[in-house]
Amino acid sequence: MAKHLFTSESVSEGHPDKIADQISDAVLDAILQQDPKARVACETYVKTGMVLVGGEITTSAWVDIEEITRNTVREIGYVHSDMGFDANSCAVLSAIGKQSPDINQGVDRADPLEQGAGDQGLMFGYATNETDVLMPAPITYAHRLVQRQAEVRKNGTLPWLRPDAKSQVTFQYDDGKIVGIDAVVLSTQHAEDIDQKSLQEAVMEEIIKPILPSEWLNTSTKFFINPTGRFVIGGPMGDCGLTGRKIIVDTYGGMARHGGGAFSGKDPSKVDRSAAYAARYVAKNIVAAGLADRCEIQVSYAIGVAEPTSIMVETFGTEKVSSEQLTLLVREFFDLRPYGLIQMLDLLHPIYKETAAYGHFGRENFPWEKTDKAQLLRDAAGLK
Protein backbone atom coordinates (compact mmCIF):
# COMPACT_ATOMS: atom_id res chain seq x y z
CA MET A 1 0.00 0.00 0.00
CA ALA A 2 3.05 2.27 0.55
CA LYS A 3 2.25 5.91 1.42
CA HIS A 4 -1.28 7.26 1.42
CA LEU A 5 -3.51 9.84 3.08
CA PHE A 6 -6.81 9.14 4.82
CA THR A 7 -9.33 11.72 6.03
CA SER A 8 -12.28 11.56 8.44
CA GLU A 9 -14.61 14.27 9.73
CA SER A 10 -16.81 14.84 12.75
CA VAL A 11 -19.41 17.39 13.80
CA SER A 12 -20.30 18.86 17.17
CA GLU A 13 -23.43 18.31 19.23
CA GLY A 14 -24.70 21.69 17.96
CA HIS A 15 -24.62 20.67 14.28
CA PRO A 16 -28.23 20.60 12.96
CA ASP A 17 -28.16 16.88 12.04
CA LYS A 18 -26.74 16.04 15.46
CA ILE A 19 -29.40 18.12 17.24
CA ALA A 20 -31.94 15.92 15.44
CA ASP A 21 -30.12 12.70 16.40
CA GLN A 22 -29.95 13.74 20.06
CA ILE A 23 -33.64 14.66 20.22
CA SER A 24 -34.60 11.31 18.65
CA ASP A 25 -32.45 9.40 21.13
CA ALA A 26 -33.63 11.51 24.08
CA VAL A 27 -37.21 10.51 23.20
CA LEU A 28 -36.11 6.86 22.89
CA ASP A 29 -34.38 6.94 26.30
CA ALA A 30 -37.40 8.51 28.00
CA ILE A 31 -39.65 5.77 26.62
CA LEU A 32 -37.24 2.90 27.43
CA GLN A 33 -36.98 4.17 31.00
CA GLN A 34 -40.70 3.41 31.45
CA ASP A 35 -41.17 0.61 28.91
CA PRO A 36 -38.05 -1.41 27.95
CA LYS A 37 -40.01 -3.42 25.38
CA ALA A 38 -41.30 -0.37 23.50
CA ARG A 39 -41.03 -0.21 19.72
CA VAL A 40 -39.59 3.16 18.75
CA ALA A 41 -38.67 4.69 15.40
CA CYS A 42 -38.36 8.42 16.10
CA GLU A 43 -37.29 10.91 13.42
CA THR A 44 -36.57 14.61 13.98
CA TYR A 45 -36.35 17.59 11.63
CA VAL A 46 -34.97 20.96 12.79
CA LYS A 47 -35.01 24.32 11.02
CA THR A 48 -35.03 27.97 12.07
CA GLY A 49 -37.41 28.31 15.00
CA MET A 50 -38.92 24.85 14.60
CA VAL A 51 -38.55 21.17 15.57
CA LEU A 52 -40.73 18.43 14.06
CA VAL A 53 -40.68 15.04 15.82
CA GLY A 54 -42.33 12.15 13.99
CA GLY A 55 -42.22 8.40 13.56
CA GLU A 56 -43.79 5.16 14.72
CA ILE A 57 -43.93 4.42 18.44
CA THR A 58 -45.77 1.56 20.17
CA THR A 59 -45.50 1.78 23.96
CA SER A 60 -47.33 1.82 27.27
CA ALA A 61 -45.20 4.81 28.33
CA TRP A 62 -46.23 8.45 28.26
CA VAL A 63 -43.53 11.04 27.65
CA ASP A 64 -43.65 14.79 27.10
CA ILE A 65 -42.14 15.20 23.62
CA GLU A 66 -42.07 18.99 23.85
CA GLU A 67 -40.28 19.06 27.20
CA ILE A 68 -37.72 16.43 26.07
CA THR A 69 -37.05 18.42 22.90
CA ARG A 70 -36.58 21.75 24.67
CA ASN A 71 -34.35 20.23 27.37
CA THR A 72 -32.15 18.57 24.74
CA VAL A 73 -31.72 21.78 22.74
CA ARG A 74 -31.04 23.67 25.98
CA GLU A 75 -28.32 21.21 27.08
CA ILE A 76 -26.63 21.56 23.70
CA GLY A 77 -26.45 25.31 24.30
CA TYR A 78 -28.99 26.99 22.01
CA VAL A 79 -30.60 29.27 24.58
CA HIS A 80 -30.76 32.66 22.86
CA SER A 81 -32.08 33.96 19.56
CA ASP A 82 -28.64 35.56 18.91
CA MET A 83 -27.39 32.02 18.25
CA GLY A 84 -30.05 31.49 15.59
CA PHE A 85 -32.03 29.00 17.68
CA ASP A 86 -33.62 29.16 21.12
CA ALA A 87 -34.80 26.17 23.17
CA ASN A 88 -37.28 28.35 25.02
CA SER A 89 -39.12 29.85 22.05
CA CYS A 90 -38.81 27.36 19.16
CA ALA A 91 -41.99 25.65 17.97
CA VAL A 92 -42.20 21.90 18.70
CA LEU A 93 -44.49 19.86 16.44
CA SER A 94 -45.27 16.16 16.92
CA ALA A 95 -46.47 13.66 14.29
CA ILE A 96 -46.21 10.18 15.80
CA GLY A 97 -48.11 7.00 14.88
CA LYS A 98 -47.86 3.31 15.88
CA GLN A 99 -45.64 0.56 14.48
CA SER A 100 -47.26 -1.40 11.66
CA PRO A 101 -48.90 -4.64 12.93
CA ASP A 102 -47.42 -6.35 9.83
CA ILE A 103 -43.91 -5.65 11.15
CA ASN A 104 -44.91 -6.43 14.72
CA GLN A 105 -46.05 -9.98 13.91
CA GLY A 106 -42.63 -10.72 12.40
CA VAL A 107 -40.72 -9.45 15.43
CA ASP A 108 -42.69 -10.66 18.46
CA ARG A 109 -42.46 -14.35 19.43
CA ALA A 110 -43.67 -16.49 22.36
CA ASP A 111 -40.04 -17.63 22.81
CA PRO A 112 -37.96 -14.43 23.08
CA LEU A 113 -34.89 -16.15 21.57
CA GLU A 114 -36.87 -16.60 18.36
CA GLN A 115 -37.56 -12.85 18.11
CA GLY A 116 -37.31 -11.98 14.43
CA ALA A 117 -35.26 -9.14 12.99
CA GLY A 118 -37.28 -5.93 12.70
CA ASP A 119 -36.15 -5.51 9.09
CA GLN A 120 -33.87 -6.97 6.48
CA GLY A 121 -30.46 -5.38 6.10
CA LEU A 122 -26.69 -5.61 6.34
CA MET A 123 -24.52 -4.17 9.09
CA PHE A 124 -20.77 -3.78 9.55
CA GLY A 125 -18.53 -3.63 12.60
CA TYR A 126 -14.85 -2.71 12.60
CA ALA A 127 -11.82 -2.50 14.86
CA THR A 128 -8.14 -1.71 14.39
CA ASN A 129 -5.21 -1.62 16.80
CA GLU A 130 -3.94 1.79 15.61
CA THR A 131 -5.43 3.59 18.66
CA ASP A 132 -5.92 2.73 22.33
CA VAL A 133 -9.70 2.46 21.82
CA LEU A 134 -9.22 0.10 18.83
CA MET A 135 -10.72 2.63 16.41
CA PRO A 136 -9.28 4.31 13.31
CA ALA A 137 -7.21 7.36 14.26
CA PRO A 138 -8.76 9.86 11.79
CA ILE A 139 -12.31 9.58 13.17
CA THR A 140 -11.08 9.25 16.77
CA TYR A 141 -9.20 12.55 16.67
CA ALA A 142 -11.88 14.30 14.61
CA HIS A 143 -14.36 13.43 17.41
CA ARG A 144 -11.97 14.55 20.14
CA LEU A 145 -11.51 17.96 18.49
CA VAL A 146 -15.23 18.78 18.44
CA GLN A 147 -15.65 17.33 21.94
CA ARG A 148 -12.94 19.71 23.10
CA GLN A 149 -14.71 22.58 21.30
CA ALA A 150 -17.86 21.83 23.33
CA GLU A 151 -15.84 21.55 26.54
CA VAL A 152 -14.12 24.95 26.25
CA ARG A 153 -17.39 26.52 25.07
CA LYS A 154 -19.35 25.23 28.06
CA ASN A 155 -16.72 25.79 30.77
CA GLY A 156 -16.22 29.42 29.77
CA THR A 157 -12.63 29.14 28.52
CA LEU A 158 -13.73 30.48 25.12
CA PRO A 159 -17.13 32.08 25.84
CA TRP A 160 -17.52 33.45 22.30
CA LEU A 161 -17.78 29.94 20.83
CA ARG A 162 -21.22 28.80 19.68
CA PRO A 163 -22.58 25.22 19.51
CA ASP A 164 -22.17 24.44 15.78
CA ALA A 165 -18.75 23.10 14.71
CA LYS A 166 -17.05 20.66 12.34
CA SER A 167 -13.64 19.02 12.29
CA GLN A 168 -11.66 17.07 9.71
CA VAL A 169 -8.29 15.36 10.09
CA THR A 170 -6.08 13.91 7.34
CA PHE A 171 -3.56 11.29 8.48
CA GLN A 172 -0.43 10.17 6.63
CA TYR A 173 0.12 6.42 6.46
CA ASP A 174 3.20 4.53 5.33
CA ASP A 175 2.72 0.82 4.74
CA GLY A 176 -0.43 0.87 6.86
CA LYS A 177 1.17 2.65 9.84
CA ILE A 178 0.52 6.26 10.89
CA VAL A 179 3.51 8.55 10.28
CA GLY A 180 1.90 11.96 10.77
CA ILE A 181 -1.01 14.34 10.33
CA ASP A 182 -1.12 16.10 6.97
CA ALA A 183 -4.05 18.50 7.47
CA VAL A 184 -6.49 19.67 10.14
CA VAL A 185 -9.72 21.56 9.48
CA LEU A 186 -11.74 23.08 12.30
CA SER A 187 -14.71 25.35 11.67
CA THR A 188 -16.60 26.70 14.64
CA GLN A 189 -19.58 28.99 14.98
CA HIS A 190 -18.70 32.10 16.98
CA ALA A 191 -20.10 35.34 18.37
CA GLU A 192 -20.13 38.42 16.15
CA ASP A 193 -17.52 40.33 18.14
CA ILE A 194 -14.48 38.01 17.89
CA ASP A 195 -11.93 38.79 15.16
CA GLN A 196 -10.51 36.08 12.90
CA LYS A 197 -6.92 36.31 14.15
CA SER A 198 -7.89 35.99 17.83
CA LEU A 199 -10.23 33.11 17.01
CA GLN A 200 -7.57 31.20 15.07
CA GLU A 201 -4.97 31.62 17.83
CA ALA A 202 -7.40 30.55 20.57
CA VAL A 203 -8.66 27.51 18.63
CA MET A 204 -5.07 26.41 17.98
CA GLU A 205 -3.99 26.81 21.62
CA GLU A 206 -7.14 25.63 23.43
CA ILE A 207 -8.60 23.01 21.07
CA ILE A 208 -6.10 21.65 18.54
CA LYS A 209 -2.81 21.50 20.51
CA PRO A 210 -4.27 19.82 23.63
CA ILE A 211 -5.90 17.07 21.52
CA LEU A 212 -3.58 16.14 18.64
CA PRO A 213 -0.39 14.25 19.64
CA SER A 214 2.61 16.50 18.97
CA GLU A 215 4.65 13.64 17.51
CA TRP A 216 2.21 13.48 14.57
CA LEU A 217 2.42 17.23 13.87
CA ASN A 218 5.29 18.70 11.86
CA THR A 219 6.21 21.82 9.91
CA SER A 220 4.32 20.62 6.84
CA THR A 221 1.04 19.96 8.70
CA LYS A 222 -1.60 22.33 7.31
CA PHE A 223 -4.16 23.98 9.60
CA PHE A 224 -7.43 25.43 8.32
CA ILE A 225 -9.28 27.23 11.13
CA ASN A 226 -12.57 28.82 10.02
CA PRO A 227 -11.20 29.08 6.47
CA THR A 228 -14.22 31.06 5.17
CA GLY A 229 -13.32 33.84 7.63
CA ARG A 230 -16.75 34.03 9.28
CA PHE A 231 -19.16 31.54 10.90
CA VAL A 232 -21.74 33.54 12.88
CA ILE A 233 -24.87 32.05 11.32
CA GLY A 234 -24.96 28.37 12.27
CA GLY A 235 -27.07 25.60 13.73
CA PRO A 236 -30.60 25.13 12.38
CA MET A 237 -30.60 28.71 11.05
CA GLY A 238 -27.71 27.90 8.74
CA ASP A 239 -28.93 24.46 7.64
CA CYS A 240 -31.89 22.25 8.40
CA GLY A 241 -31.08 19.07 10.32
CA LEU A 242 -32.41 15.52 10.05
CA THR A 243 -32.01 12.36 12.12
CA GLY A 244 -29.74 9.79 10.48
CA ARG A 245 -27.79 12.09 8.17
CA LYS A 246 -24.36 11.56 9.76
CA ILE A 247 -23.94 7.79 9.49
CA ILE A 248 -20.21 7.91 8.65
CA VAL A 249 -19.46 10.34 11.50
CA ASP A 250 -21.44 7.96 13.75
CA THR A 251 -19.33 4.94 12.79
CA TYR A 252 -15.77 4.66 11.40
CA GLY A 253 -15.21 7.84 9.41
CA GLY A 254 -15.20 5.97 6.10
CA MET A 255 -12.44 3.54 7.12
CA ALA A 256 -14.90 0.63 7.15
CA ARG A 257 -17.91 -0.18 5.02
CA HIS A 258 -21.43 0.80 6.04
CA GLY A 259 -24.72 -1.03 5.55
CA GLY A 260 -26.66 2.22 5.13
CA GLY A 261 -28.90 2.09 8.20
CA ALA A 262 -28.85 4.97 10.68
CA PHE A 263 -28.91 4.48 14.47
CA SER A 264 -30.58 7.31 16.36
CA GLY A 265 -34.23 7.09 17.38
CA LYS A 266 -34.39 3.29 16.94
CA ASP A 267 -35.04 0.81 19.75
CA PRO A 268 -32.82 -2.32 19.95
CA SER A 269 -35.29 -4.52 18.04
CA LYS A 270 -34.11 -2.59 14.97
CA VAL A 271 -31.04 -4.53 13.79
CA ASP A 272 -29.81 -1.45 11.90
CA ARG A 273 -28.68 -0.28 15.31
CA SER A 274 -28.31 -3.28 17.61
CA ALA A 275 -26.56 -5.56 15.11
CA ALA A 276 -24.12 -2.80 14.14
CA TYR A 277 -23.26 -2.47 17.83
CA ALA A 278 -22.87 -6.25 18.10
CA ALA A 279 -20.64 -6.34 15.00
CA ARG A 280 -18.38 -3.70 16.58
CA TYR A 281 -18.29 -5.80 19.79
CA VAL A 282 -17.23 -8.88 17.81
CA ALA A 283 -14.58 -7.05 15.77
CA LYS A 284 -13.17 -5.28 18.84
CA ASN A 285 -12.84 -8.51 20.81
CA ILE A 286 -11.08 -10.22 17.88
CA VAL A 287 -8.53 -7.37 17.69
CA ALA A 288 -8.19 -7.14 21.49
CA ALA A 289 -7.51 -10.89 21.53
CA GLY A 290 -4.62 -10.39 19.11
CA LEU A 291 -6.28 -12.60 16.48
CA ALA A 292 -5.96 -9.80 13.90
CA ASP A 293 -4.65 -6.23 13.68
CA ARG A 294 -7.72 -5.08 11.75
CA CYS A 295 -11.10 -6.75 11.57
CA GLU A 296 -14.35 -6.01 9.77
CA ILE A 297 -17.51 -8.02 10.43
CA GLN A 298 -20.55 -8.11 8.18
CA VAL A 299 -23.83 -9.55 9.42
CA SER A 300 -27.17 -9.61 7.57
CA TYR A 301 -30.80 -10.39 8.41
CA ALA A 302 -34.20 -11.16 6.89
CA ILE A 303 -37.28 -9.49 8.39
CA GLY A 304 -39.05 -11.76 10.87
CA VAL A 305 -36.18 -14.30 10.95
CA ALA A 306 -33.99 -14.73 14.04
CA GLU A 307 -30.82 -16.31 12.63
CA PRO A 308 -28.54 -14.00 10.62
CA THR A 309 -28.63 -14.76 6.89
CA SER A 310 -24.84 -14.33 6.75
CA ILE A 311 -21.76 -13.61 8.85
CA MET A 312 -18.50 -12.49 7.22
CA VAL A 313 -15.09 -11.87 8.83
CA GLU A 314 -12.52 -9.78 6.90
CA THR A 315 -9.06 -9.21 8.40
CA PHE A 316 -7.18 -7.60 5.47
CA GLY A 317 -4.29 -10.06 5.67
CA THR A 318 -3.56 -9.23 9.34
CA GLU A 319 -5.09 -12.41 10.82
CA LYS A 320 -3.07 -14.70 13.13
CA VAL A 321 -5.46 -17.63 12.53
CA SER A 322 -7.45 -18.55 9.42
CA SER A 323 -10.59 -16.66 8.40
CA GLU A 324 -12.52 -19.93 8.56
CA GLN A 325 -11.47 -20.42 12.18
CA LEU A 326 -12.38 -16.82 13.02
CA THR A 327 -15.87 -17.29 11.56
CA LEU A 328 -16.35 -20.45 13.63
CA LEU A 329 -15.20 -18.61 16.77
CA VAL A 330 -17.67 -15.79 16.09
CA ARG A 331 -20.54 -18.25 15.75
CA GLU A 332 -19.45 -20.08 18.92
CA PHE A 333 -18.96 -17.11 21.25
CA PHE A 334 -21.43 -14.49 20.01
CA ASP A 335 -25.21 -14.88 19.75
CA LEU A 336 -26.13 -12.60 16.85
CA ARG A 337 -29.85 -13.35 16.85
CA PRO A 338 -31.77 -10.12 17.62
CA TYR A 339 -32.82 -11.16 21.13
CA GLY A 340 -29.45 -12.82 21.78
CA LEU A 341 -27.46 -9.70 21.03
CA ILE A 342 -29.87 -7.52 23.02
CA GLN A 343 -29.19 -9.78 26.04
CA MET A 344 -25.47 -10.07 25.30
CA LEU A 345 -25.04 -6.28 25.29
CA ASP A 346 -27.83 -5.44 27.78
CA LEU A 347 -29.43 -2.98 25.37
CA LEU A 348 -32.88 -2.41 26.93
CA HIS A 349 -31.73 0.59 28.96
CA PRO A 350 -31.86 4.36 28.35
CA ILE A 351 -28.24 4.64 27.17
CA TYR A 352 -28.74 6.07 23.70
CA LYS A 353 -28.80 9.86 23.95
CA GLU A 354 -25.12 9.84 24.88
CA THR A 355 -24.30 7.90 21.69
CA ALA A 356 -25.91 10.55 19.49
CA ALA A 357 -22.93 12.93 19.38
CA TYR A 358 -19.18 12.23 19.06
CA GLY A 359 -19.51 8.71 17.70
CA HIS A 360 -21.23 5.49 18.72
CA PHE A 361 -17.90 3.63 18.90
CA GLY A 362 -14.60 4.13 20.69
CA ARG A 363 -15.98 5.40 24.01
CA GLU A 364 -15.47 2.85 26.75
CA ASN A 365 -18.68 3.45 28.73
CA PHE A 366 -20.87 1.68 26.15
CA PRO A 367 -21.43 -2.09 26.59
CA TRP A 368 -20.45 -2.94 22.99
CA GLU A 369 -16.98 -1.52 23.74
CA LYS A 370 -16.18 -4.19 26.34
CA THR A 371 -13.39 -6.65 25.50
CA ASP A 372 -14.58 -9.29 27.96
CA LYS A 373 -14.45 -12.08 25.36
CA ALA A 374 -10.91 -11.40 24.16
CA GLN A 375 -9.22 -13.97 26.43
CA LEU A 376 -11.86 -16.62 25.64
CA LEU A 377 -11.26 -16.10 21.92
CA ARG A 378 -7.49 -16.21 22.35
CA ASP A 379 -7.64 -19.44 24.34
CA ALA A 380 -10.07 -21.07 21.91
CA ALA A 381 -7.83 -20.09 18.98
CA GLY A 382 -4.89 -21.78 20.68
CA LEU A 383 -2.72 -18.65 20.88
CA LYS A 384 -0.35 -18.42 23.80
Swiss-Prot record:
Positions annotated to bind Mg(2+): 17
Molecular function (Gene Ontology), one example: methionine adenosyltransferase activity
HAMAP family: S_AdoMet_synth1 (MF_00086)
Assembly: Homotetramer; dimer of dimers.
Source organism: Salmonella arizonae (strain ATCC BAA-731 / CDC346-86 / RSK2980)
Highest taxon listed in the record's lineage: Bacteria
UniProt keyword annotations, A-Z: ATP-binding, Cytoplasm, Magnesium, Metal-binding, Nucleotide-binding, One-carbon metabolism, Potassium, Transferase
UniProt binding sites for K(+): 43
A Pfam family hit: S-AdoMet_synt_M
Gene name linked to the record: metK
Binding sites annotated in the UniProt record for ATP: 15, 164-166, 230-231, 239, 245-246, 262, 266
Family assignment from sequence similarity: Belongs to the AdoMet synthase family.
Primary enzyme class: transferase
Binding site for L-methionine: 56, 99, 239, 270
Its EC number(s): 2.5.1.6
The record's free-text note on cofactor binding: Binds 2 divalent ions per subunit.
Lineage: Bacteria, Pseudomonadati, Pseudomonadota, Gammaproteobacteria, Enterobacterales
Residues in coiled coil: none
Principal cellular location given in the protein's record: cytoplasm
GO biological process, one term: S-adenosylmethionine biosynthetic process
Name of the molecule in the record: S-adenosylmethionine synthase
